[in-house]
């Protein structure tokens, strides 16, 4: 009990910096110039259709909120204010998005500054198992081969809007900000229909990317807080005769096992278990739990996660969202790669004096391949090819100049090769390059009233250079002074780039 209280207090020590003395101070935007609504252009004022807003507009709206009874008049007389005037769609969307994005910026400031102003006496210890997302790549290369079972987790959402607000109460103790958050969430959907309406979730996520990302990260952080605590406790179980599990509000103790107490529900018991080698990796909405334990231990972890989501976060999730597989006999989809750990045989001939014999050695190899069907589906959705992979023209780009068209196709191709450079089999990437090249030729050919073959012959090396230039330059700079490296023969070489996390959604460059 005392151990968990100390662990929880260290987690709560950050929360005092989330108390806002004044919500939306007039010049609060000046403290976060890098978190502007428009990225590198914080003063640009663009229309609502472009989804870009100026920090100046946010400030003006914040000043309006300081006016007396602004929100009260908005609720009592919705037709007198543009924010709630549903008859005027442009102003309704424009002002609501400005307000939601501005709210997200203000909430993000304490999170970004908590390390700078955290007192030394309350400094939170750094755990070795909490590392950067870039540690995913060495984990795959070095440690994945020594594990046996893998649980592929699709982190469920949505959850009820009120649950999102309640989760923030542990970190944000400013009541007006929570009321404003409820106000913004109510604006986009009905409280009762949100949990069943995927359309409302899609609209909210699309129109309020920053706010949705903050709410989702808060939810995932709370879920991982419990997961980390249980993981730390499980490593000490053989030395303990009893244990406790604590719910954040209501605490309970039971010898030799722990119980979870929830108001309105019966007691649910989850037994302690020991898993000596457990690895947890999350990327966006997917996570994996890999271990060297038994299948029974993986089922217990699955049971724990389902009960955690059901009784603490108050929403039901399907057990099929957690897949338990044996690494030697299955593959899994993570970060856009289709990965597996197959076993291969290596025959070694050994000779001792006059006797010779063969040694069959079983070796594990981490294999990553590109999901060809999925990427061709993306290209088909973006109208670069048919569903079967046959290249077609892109008529929507015919109004652009020739070099702009070449640059767009080349950039998409380079992004694909850059992101999937960690693949051990790159033949699929060359097939995608072939599709993009022909699609580019079919787009430019009719524009110049020429056939595809004649147009490709007319462009010659310039056309090919636009698709190969970036690869040759990158690899020549990396390996020219160290070792001989030929990209054209590197179909099985894996090179992980740390900046691929910036282009994680490959649908965006295709649109």
Swiss-Prot record:
One annotated GO biological process: RNA splicing
Top-level taxonomic group: Eukaryota
Chief location: plastid
Location(s), subcellular: Plastid, Chloroplast
Any GO MF annotation of the entry: RNA binding
One of the record's GO cellular component terms: chloroplast
Keyword terms: Chloroplast, mRNA processing, Plastid, RNA-binding, tRNA processing
Record-linked InterPro entries: Domain_X (IPR024937), Maturase_MatK (IPR002866), Maturase_MatK_N (IPR024942)
The UniProt record lists the keyword Chloroplast: yes
Record PANTHER family: MATURASE K (PTHR34811:SF1)
Described function: Usually encoded in the trnK tRNA gene intron. Probably assists in splicing its own and other chloroplast group II introns.
HAMAP family assigned: MatK
Family statement: Belongs to the intron maturase 2 family. MatK subfamily.
Name of this chain's protein: Maturase K
């Amino acid at each position: 009990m005392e151990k968990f209280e100390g662990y929880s207090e260290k987690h709560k020590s950050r929360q005092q910096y989330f108390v806002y003395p004044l919500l939306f101070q007039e010049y609060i935007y000046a403290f976060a110039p890098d978190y502007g609504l428009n990225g590198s252009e914080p003063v640009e004022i663009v229309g609502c259709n472009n989804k870009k807003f100026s920090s100046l507009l946010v400030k003006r709206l914040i000043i309006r909120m300081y006016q007396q009874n602004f929100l009260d008049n908005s609720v009592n007389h919705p037709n007198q204010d543009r924010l709630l005037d549903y008859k005027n769609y442009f102003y309704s969307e424009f002002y609501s998005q400005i307000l939601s994005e501005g709210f997200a910026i203000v909430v993000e400031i304490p999170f970004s500054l908590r390390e700078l102003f955290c007192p030394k006496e309350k400094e939170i210890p750094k755990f070795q198992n909490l590392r950067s997302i870039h540690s995913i790549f060495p984990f795959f290369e070095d440690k994945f081969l020594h594990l046996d079972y893998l649980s592929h987790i699709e982190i469920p959402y949505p959850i009820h809007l009120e649950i999102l607000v309640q989760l923030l109460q542990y970190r944000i103790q400013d009541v007006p900000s929570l009321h404003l958050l409820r106000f913004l969430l109510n604006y986009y959907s009905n409280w009762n229909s949100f949990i069943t309406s995927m359309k409302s979730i899609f609209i909210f996520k699309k129109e309020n990317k920053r706010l949705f990302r903050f709410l989702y990260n808060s939810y995932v952080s709370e879920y991982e807080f419990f997961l980390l605590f249980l993981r730390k406790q499980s490593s000490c179980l053989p030395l303990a005769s009893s244990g406790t599990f604590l719910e954040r509000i209501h605490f309970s103790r039971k010898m030799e096992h722990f119980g979870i107490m929830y108001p309105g529900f019966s007691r649910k018991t989850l037994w302690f278990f020991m898993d000596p080698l457990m690895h947890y990796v999350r990327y966006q909405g997917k996570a994996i739990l890999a271990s060297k334990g038994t299948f029974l231990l993986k089922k217990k972890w699955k049971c724990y996660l389902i009960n955690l989501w059901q009784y603490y976060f108050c929403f039901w999730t399907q057990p099929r969202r957690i897949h338990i597989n044996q690494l030697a006999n299955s593959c899994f989809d993570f970060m856009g790669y289709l990965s597996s750990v197959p076993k291969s045989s290596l025959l070694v001939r050994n000779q001792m004096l006059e006797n010779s014999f063969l040694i069959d050695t079983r070796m594990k190899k981490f294999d990553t391949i590109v999901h060809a069907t999925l990427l061709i589906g993306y290209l088909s959705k973006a109208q670069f090819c048919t569903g079967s992979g046959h290249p077609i023209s892109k008529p929507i780009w015919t109004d652009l100049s020739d070099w702009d068209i070449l640059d767009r196709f080349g950039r998409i191709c380079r992004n694909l090769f850059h992101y999937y450079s960690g693949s051990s089999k790159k033949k699929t990437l060359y097939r995608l390059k072939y599709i993009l090249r022909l699609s580019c030729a079919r787009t430019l050919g009719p524009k110049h009233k020429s056939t595809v073959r004649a147009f490709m012959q007319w462009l010659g090396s310039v056309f090919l250079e636009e698709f190969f230039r970036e690869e040759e330059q990158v690899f020549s700079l990396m390996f020219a002074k160290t070792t001989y490296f030929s990209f054209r023969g590197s179909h099985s070489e894996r090179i992980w780039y740390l900046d691929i996390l910036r282009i994680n959604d490959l649908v965006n460059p295709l649109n």
